[in-house]
Each structure stands twice: as structure tokens, then as C-alpha cells.
Curated annotation (Swiss-Prot):
Function: Regulates glucokinase (GCK) by forming an inactive complex with this enzyme. Acts by promoting GCK recruitment to the nucleus, possibly to provide a reserve of GCK that can be quickly released in the cytoplasm after a meal. The affinity of GCKR for GCK is modulated by fructose metabolites: GCKR with bound fructose 6-phosphate has increased affinity for GCK, while GCKR with bound fructose 1-phosphate has strongly decreased affinity for GCK and does not inhibit GCK activity.
Phenotypic consequence of residue 413 to A: Impairs inhibition of glucokinase
GO molecular function, one term: fructose-6-phosphate binding
InterPro entries tied to this protein: GKRP_SIS_2, Glucokinase_regulatory_CS, MURQ/GCKR, SIS_dom, SIS_dom_sf
Lineage: Eukaryota, Metazoa, Chordata, Craniata, Vertebrata
Binding site for beta-D-fructose 1-phosphate: 109-110, 153, 179-181, 348, 514
Entry similarity comment: Belongs to the GCKR family.
Every SIS domain range: 90-286, 320-499
Domain comment as written in the entry: Fructose 1-phosphate and fructose 6-phosphate compete for the same binding site.
Family matches, as Pfam families: GKRP-like_C, GKRP_SIS_2, GKRP_SIS_N
Name of the protein in its database record: Glucokinase regulatory protein
Length: 625
């Protein structure tokens, strides 16, 4: 409501949503709830998809409601206070860098964000002539940065081993563990390990659920659940021996797709906090809320500037969707760190939409020699690990066809002669090229380069008169803006392809325990049947044609994930089996006869005796997270 906000905002955020009501999908964590804004996402055209996803992104900046303050938000006093405290702890390490280290850690999207931010802040420190103090850990190692290897985040011991390697011999280590849903065992193990040695370690947990919604099922190789670890951290926060930063940002526009808002909010929160620490330590003062708010407003401005390009974003979405529909490919070619954003978007389509790694791929143009921990892990590993300029020119360019779409992502500070050369080479193969070009007021794209593109999403940023660290605000804005555009385009393209039911991705590949629980939640949501029955159907679909034995039923979730990861259409088959009360073989036949997965499920839901729509998820038992 106007007039009730504590702070002045750059953008208009949506009114507090239905998802904030305590009874809405009560048993499901916020990060897995369905967003009421997008309940008809599957019926939207490209323009409306951009509008709806833009509204979901704006919820990141929503303040706590005056009448309805169920959850703490990014601008809540408690969150801002914790951010100031953590920034102060980072400053202590910056002031005495010998033996100091800041570790950013996570699995999947969170690990890729950890990678991107450690690269950025090391770059900032090198530019000041300082020794870089940041490193990153990603479940599964460097290969997980450029390829989809999601199952790796399910081991707490793996997380601890990796942390011990990088922290060996250090005297003061701040470990920022990122888990959007407060669910990744990889991070839980690290946080627990840090709490057992607070003389050296300071654990900081970042996620976007209340601690009461953190995952509470057993971790296979650890004695505590994620929720128990987070509760222990909250107790230690009273003495500033651990910190939990977990504002609510609302459900994802595509249910559970934490690469979107979860990834963006991670970037916004941590870059704000860390940049405030660097800016103020150089001035010899402590970080303040005022400094945090100034930086947060620049990210709000990024939202405004990005979504002012909505018509062109919708056009790009349609072009990408057409290429994918014709079985063509989409290549996202980005310069410098915008190339990292491009790689992330392509990789994340694999597990989000069950896409082939060749469908949407990102490439990084520019030097990346000092970005990775273990560059050797990425050399000669096969086509899905290729991402460099050389890879694009030697293995992609020769095989480009007219049905492929290539998106060039650069700033006007990049080497525009190099951009033009690559664009000209691509244009000989396909006319489906687009540009996402970032400029500062006063810069213009050279005419010869401009003429090569039929359409350009041109984003102009205001001049920022900041000191050195302030230059990074512009870099962070451009990265976030690029992420918003690419996430919206790739998500929307798959919506237009008919892959989404309401705002749920039914046909995802179950590649980790989080996705196993999400699959179970969807079966309960759409079938209205009991948890026990849904588990039975899910296990039958996973292990088919092997009959379900008591041994299989009693097996740990990792065994089911291992089998499910290799299979397609597990969830739709399990759901059709529940809706038609039929065998797995009959469910497969129903699916094969339908034009698409979503059509098969829609017609089953509309059949005699079925519920017409999915009810809000009140049937889930509280222990299913």
C-alpha cells in the first residue's frame, strides 16, 4: 500500500501476495510454492510471460507488509542489521588479510553464483593492488560450473572435504554457504563443520525460506538435518559466531525454479553486502544500512531499466522458441563475465526443462585463465564441457544452420571490432541473430555493427560518479540485467513450447533429492491422492520394468535418484498412472498417444471423476520438504 513503505523505492513492487498468507500451501517451503501471479503462465503469450516474470522478479524488493508481516524480507530491519554485521566481519578479514579467506559455496545455480562473485571480488582486489582473498566451492567441482551435474549437492561429506582443502593453513575463514531452499546437504555439512571450529571459521548461511521451512529429512551421510543445522546457527547468531541471512522473496514464477529469483536474490544480497564492506573499509569506516540501501537501489534500477525493454525481450523469446521447436539450437555468446551468465542460463535449461545440452548453450568470449580453481578439469572433457571462444569458432560455427538463433551479449566497453568479426562470420550461416548490448549514457554502437543486427535489446545505464569500487556496481547491474533477460527468454521459450502445466515444470529430470521431493509434491498436488500412494507410483515409474520389492521401497533416496536421473518422463508417467489408476505400461501408452506431456495430463485431469484443477497443496504432510 502506498504510504506504508519505510524506504523510497525505484520500482513499484506488486502488492503483498496470496503466498504470504499463513495457510497458503502451508506444508510447502516458499521456494517450492506456486506463485499466484503466474498460475496461468501456460496460457500466456510472449508479451504476458515477460510481464508476469518481471512482476515476480520485482517481489525480491517488496517490503514487509504493514498489515501482513508473515515473513522477513530483504528490506526488513532484521535482515539489514545482519547484513551490516556480516559486512563488518568481512572487513575484519580485509584489514588483516594474512591467513584470511572468504569462501562462497553452493551446489547448482548457487555454486555458479559463488563462482561468479568470487571472480568479481578477486578482480576488484587485484585492481587495488591487493592480494585476492576470495575463493568458491561448487558441488561436483569446476565441471559443474559449465555443465549440469546436479546430483553432486547431496553429500555433506563432499562439502566438508572440499572446504578443508581450501581452508588448510588459514587463520580466519568466512564461509558463505548458499542454498536457496535451505536444503543442500553439501552446504549443511560445511556450516556444521564451521560451527565446530569457530576459532577459525565463521559460517554465514544464505537462503530464501524461513528456518522452520528448511529441509528436515535425514541427510544420508550426515547426522543432522538441514533444519537442525540452521537452528543451531540461529542460536549462535546471538553471539555473532554464525549468521543466517534468509529473507523471503516469494515463490518462483516457474514453481521451484530457483535459478531465477533465488539466483538473482543471492547475487543482489551478497554483492550488496560484500561491496559495502569493500567501499567502507577503504574509507576507514564501518558499513552502514545507508550504504547497503544505496547499493540495493541500484539493483532496483537495474530491474526498471531491464524490463523497460519488454517488447524486445518478448521478440527474442519467440525467436528462441521457434528455433527450439524446429529442433534448432540457441547459442548465447557473451563477453567477459556476461559470458558466465550466458553459460549459466544454458546449463540450467538442462535440468529445469529436461533439455538436451545442445539446445541452449552459452559461450564466454575473453580471457578466463585465472577464473577457475581447477582449469584442468575442463580440458578435453567432451562437447558438453566446451564454452570458450575457440570452442565456439571451431566446433559450433562450422555447423550453424538457418534454424539456429545466436544471441550476442556485450557492453560498448568491450572490443567491438572482435564482436563485429564474429557476428559477420555467424551471419554467413544464419540470419537469426540478436544483440543484447549494454552502454552508458553518451556511448553509441558503431553504425557498421548496428546494421548487422535485425533487432537489438539496447540497455543504456546512467553515468555513475563513484570511486573505484563503485565501478563494480555498473558491472553487477549489467550482469543481473543480462541474467533477467536470459532467464525470462529461456523460461518463456519453453512455456511457448507447451512444456509447462499452469506454472509447474512437470517433465523435469529427477537428478537430486530436492527434485525427488518436488516430484512427490507435484504428484500429490495434481492427483489429490495420499502421500503413500504417490510415493508408490513414483517409485514404480522410476524402477520400471523392475517390479517394486520391499528392498527397493526401503532403499535410500540416493538409489532412486541414481535410477531416475537416467530416465525421461518419470513424473508424467507416475501422474497418469495415479489419475487413470492404471499400470505404468498403460500410463506410457496414454502419454505416447498425446501431442505433448502437458496435453496428456490436461486431458486426464479433465476426464470423468477427476478434479478439474489442482487444489492448493494442503494435503502434503509436513515432513515432505
Amino acid at each position: 500500500m502506498p504510504g506504508t513503505k519505510r524506504f523510497q523505492h525505484v520500482i513499484e513492487t506488486p502488492e503483498p501476495g496470496k503466498w504470504e498468507l499463513s495457510g497458503y500451501e502451508a506444508a510447502v517451503p516458499i521456494t517450492e510454492k506456486s506463485n499466484p501471479l503466474t498460475q496461468d503462465l501456460d496460457k500466456a503469450d510472449a508479451e504476458n510471460i515477460v510481464r508476469l516474470l518481471g512482476q515476480c522478479d520485482a517481489e525480491i524488493f517488496q517490503e514487509e507488509g504493514q498489515a501482513l508481516s508473515t515473513y522477513q524480507r530483504l528490506y526488513s530491519e532484521s535482515i539489514l542489521t545482519t547484513m551490516v554485521q556480516v559486512a563488518g566481519k568481512v572487513q575484519e578479514v580485509l584489514k588483516e588479510p594474512d591467513g584470511g579467506l572468504v569462501v562462497l559455496s553452493g551446489g547448482g545455480t548457487s555454486g555458479r553464483m559463488a563462482f561468479l562473485m568470487s571472480v568479481s571480488f578477486n578482480q576488484l582486489m587485484k585492481g587495488l593492488g591487493q592480494k585476492p582473498l576470495y575463493t568458491y566451492l561448487i558441488a561436483g567441482g569446476d565441471r559443474s560450473v559449465v555443465a549440469s551435474r546436479e546430483g553432486t549437492e547431496d553429500s555433506a561429506l563432499h562439502g566438508i572435504e572440499e572446504l578443508k582443502k581450501v581452508a588448510a593453513g588459514k587463520k580466519r575463514v568466512i564461509v558463505i554457504g548458499i542454498s536457496v531452499g535451505l536444503s543442500a546437504p553439501f552446504v549443511a555439512g560445511q556450516m556444521d563443520c564451521c560451527m565446530n571450529n569457530t576459532a577459525v571459521f565463521l559460517p554465514v548461511l544464505v537462503g530464501f525460506n524461513p528456518v522452520s521451512m528448511a529441509r528436515n529429512d535425514p541427510i544420508e551421510d550426515w547426522s543432522s538435518t538441514f533444519r537442525q543445522v540452521a537452528e543451531r546457527m540461529q542460536k549462535m547468531q546471538e553471539k555473532q559466531k554464525a549468521f543466517v541471512l534468509n529473507p523471503a522473496i516469494g515463490p518462483e514464477g516457474l514453481s521451484g525454479s530457483s535459478r531465477m529469483k533465488g539466483g538473482s536474490a543471492t547475487k543482489i544480497l551478497l554483492e550488496t553486502l560484500l561491496l559495502a564492506a569493500h567501499k567502507t573499509v577503504d574509507q576507514g569506516i564501518a558499513a552502514s544500512q545507508r550504504c547497503l540501501l544505496e547499493i540495493l537501489r541500484t539493483f532496483e534500477r537495474a530491474h526498471q531499466v531491464t524490463y523497460s525493454q519488454s517488447p524486445k525481450i518478448a521478440t527474442l523469446m519467440k525467436s528462441v522458441s521457434t528455433s527450439l521447436e524446429k529442433k534448432g539450437h540457441v547459442y548465447l555468446v557473451g563477453w567477459q563475465t556476461l559470458g558466465i551468465i550466458a553459460i549459466m542460463d544454458g546449463v540450467e535449461c538442462i535440468h529445469t526443462f529436461g533439455a538436451d545440452f545442445r539446445d541452449v548453450r552459452g559461450f564466454l568470449i575473453g580471457d578466463h585463465s585465472d577464473m577457475f580453481n581447477q582449469k584442468a578439469e575442463l580440458t578435453n572433457q567432451g562437447p558438453q564441457f566446451t564454452f570458450s571462444q575457440e570452442d565456439f569458432l571451431t566446433s559450433i560455427l562450422p555447423s550453424l544452420t538457418e534454424i539456429d538463433t545466436v544471441v550476442f551479449i556485450f557492453t560498448l566497453d568491450d572490443n567491438l571490432t572482435e564482436v563485429q568479426t564474429i557476428v559477420e562470420q555467424v551471419k554467413e550461416k544464419t540470419n537469426h541473430i540478436q544483440a543484447l548490448a549494454h552502454s552508458t549514457v553518451g556511448q553509441t554502437l558503431p553504425i557498421p555493427l548496428k546494421k548487422l543486427f535485425p533487432s537489438i535489446i539496447s540497455i543504456t545505464w546512467p553515468l555513475l560518479f563513484f570511486e573505484y569500487e563503485g565501478n563494480f556496481i555498473q558491472k553487477f547491474q549489467r550482469e543481473l540485467s543480462t541474467k533477467w533477460v536470459l532467464n525470462t527468454v529461456s523460461t518463456g521459450a519453453h512455456v511457448l513450447l507447451g512444456k509447462i502445466l499452469q506454472n509447474h515444470m512437470l517433465d523435469l529430470r529427477i537428478s537430486n533429492s530436492k527434485l525427488f521431493w518436488r516430484a512427490l509434491a507435484m504428484l500429490q498436488r495434481f492427483s489429490g491422492q495420499s502421500k503413500a500412494r504417490c510415493i508408490e507410483s513414483l517409485l514404480r515409474a522410476i524402477h520400471f520394468p523392475q517390479p517394486l520389492s520391499d528392498d527397493i521401497r526401503a532403499a535410500p533416496i540416493s538409489c532412486h535418484v541414481q535410477v531416475a536421473h537416467e530416465k525421461e518422463q518419470v513424473i508424467p508417467i507416475a501422474l497418469l498412472s495415479l489419475l487413470f489408476r492404471c499400470s505404468i505400461t498403460e500410463a506410457q501408452a496414454h502419454l505416447a498417444a498425446a501431442p505433448s506431456v502437458c496435453e496428456a495430463v490436461r486431458s486426464a485431469l479433465a476426464g470423468p471423476g477427476q478434479k478439474r484443477t489442482a487444489d492448493p497443496l494442503e494435503i502434503l504432510e509436513p515432513d515432505v520438504q
